[in-house]
Amino acid sequence: MDEKRIKRKNTFKVIRSVLETLIILAVVLWGLWSLVEYRRQSRVMTDSLPVTCVMIPSDEIVFGYESAGKAQGEHFIAISYNGITENPRVGGKIVTKASLEKQIEALKASGYQTITQQDVINFYRNNDPLPDRALLLILEDGIMYSAELAQPELVKNNYIATVCTFAQNMSDAHGLYITAEEAKMLNQTSYWETGSNGYRLSYINVFDRFENYFGHLNTAEFLDIHNYLRRDYNHYLMDFLRDENRLRTESVSEMEERIAWDYEKMNEIYQDELGYVPGLYILMHSNTGAFGNDPLVSMKNAEMMEKYFSLNFNRQGTCLNMLDSSIYDLSRLQSRQYFSTNHLMMRIWDDTGHRVMFRLGDERKAADWERRSGVAEYTEEGIILTSMPYGQAKIRLLRELPKNLDLTVRLQGNMVGQQALILRADDNGENGITVRLHDNVLYLEEGAGEQPLLELDLLQFDGGPFFSKAQEEYNGKLALAYTIIANDTDEDRIRAAEAELEQLQGAVVPGIADGAEPFVPELDIDDEDDRILRIRLEGTSISCWLDGVQIADGQRVGAGSGNNLFLEAEVTRGSERFSQTNLSDDVYDGIFNCLNITDLEGKSLYSLAPIPVSEDAGGFLTAAMDWIVRLFHGINNNVFFRMEQERFARESKP
């Protein structure tokens, strides 16, 4: 290489280094500006917050309503958590630490006192009395990190909880699950006692949503493919092992021997590692109507659990347990990630009829609104509006608005359910202009709303459907082959998966563009949503934007019957909605964050909280930081894991 070329190359390196430095500096300055602006806006949001959160009794909230259940005579309630996390973006069944703190606070304020497993045993065996508001608290996931996050709340409120374990993991010091030593450490405090989820967490008779047989899966395999399933699978102890035609592959005696082995192994491990078998058992899965999906399996489970355990939680979805309940057929209410505090308390009220405390939040923000039904919590970001069971929640802004206005709101209630804004409404919230999100469809309605002015399917709005049914089915088979190769221990099964993978990689799969039928995902009650809605009313026209995209431009509307603004939340009625975990929910949380209203010139008329700048800048900052990582580590954008080369991207849009 001659001297000129070397000099030219070095000059290029200097220029590139200068440019890279300038870009990094710009990113840092942008980040600092976003942080300062976010903190400034946070001060705006928090200046009006009360020192303590206000609680209100349920009397006025539920007046005129009847709870579905009645806690008459001796009883207790059971509340469980499938896991605790600090990350609010985890989703699914895992509750955040912040939500746990608020829910425990409300339970304590409602007078609930935790009881032990022995209290429950004595209650059923000896008819010993329980406290008036007896609560059995359970942490189900068996992960040590969840217990660590929950511990401060137990200490603060002098509560005790049962932490469940898997016997198989008692000696696995390198895993996430609670070991024998950790269980002993927890039990040495006065805040924990040990329960059991069984020997293992594994799945049998698994079929995907297209009825393809996926076989029997361990935990890691199931987690990799569960997005391709409906409810067509079972836990290890709940049925006979079956083949692709759903025919038994084991005799009755083989089934009984297989199930007995798990219980006997549990007994052996717990005795060796802990010195005792925990009293509390949670048979997975719940809500089968018995102790398994087959009567013979149910009989064997009943025999074995009564031999080794003192009590069993067999049902999920309601919290009330009466004296005439079976100690081996108890029920717990599992708080979900999407449960607000008031959601949990509304479910408890509906199960028991107890006088409970609801969370009002910021009473100064609450003073701007009139409650018509349901219950509202006024938070730092906005309003969480919780419906009555199988009903509605409705509030009215206590200030008259002009006919012409510009409104922006962030809607973060789950997809399954209804959240709505009604503008230009009369004093009853009727005869106005309504923008409603209902089961992932946006409706623009006027008056009684018999014929919507606009009906927008939000899957299509987002660019979907993204895959054909054939592609989705292919994705599931591909994911199964990869996870078996990565996580299975059966060499024959791994070889079969490798052969299947080779065949799949040579397949030509028709997409939507090829005329194949689109795949439309079924909504689950756990599905979250996050939309920014803008509404501009001017005379007899309305314009709307969703996530920055205009969806209505000067649509003709009437003057309405008043100048009121109502917010509504309502549970989806008519039929049980799909839940992969076989649960239904008769309460809905509408979440109205960052509500801002101005006149057409931009003068503020009402504001709950601005949309933080960091929300808008977050995508840019993340992308910039990813670029920096690639820059300094020499990562080529075109290099991906082999699995990602072969399968269709589930999250990306075309």
Cite the ranges covered by each PLM segment.
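N-terminal Lys/Arg-rich, disordered targeting/topogenic segments
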Residues: 1-15
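Low-complexity, Ser/Thr/Pro/Gly-rich disordered linker/stalk regions
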Residues: 340-405, 603-654
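Secretory/extracellular carbohydrate-interaction modules
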Residues: 386-499, 620, 640
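His/Asp/Glu-enriched short active-site or ligand-binding loop at hydrolase and phosphoryl-transfer sites
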Residues: 165-166, 221, 273-338
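Metal-dependent polysaccharide deacetylase catalytic core of the NodB/CE4 family, i.e.
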Residues: 82-87, 91, 134-135, 155-288, ...
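Carbohydrate-binding surfaces in secreted/extracellular proteins
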Residues: 409-411, 475-515, 521-561
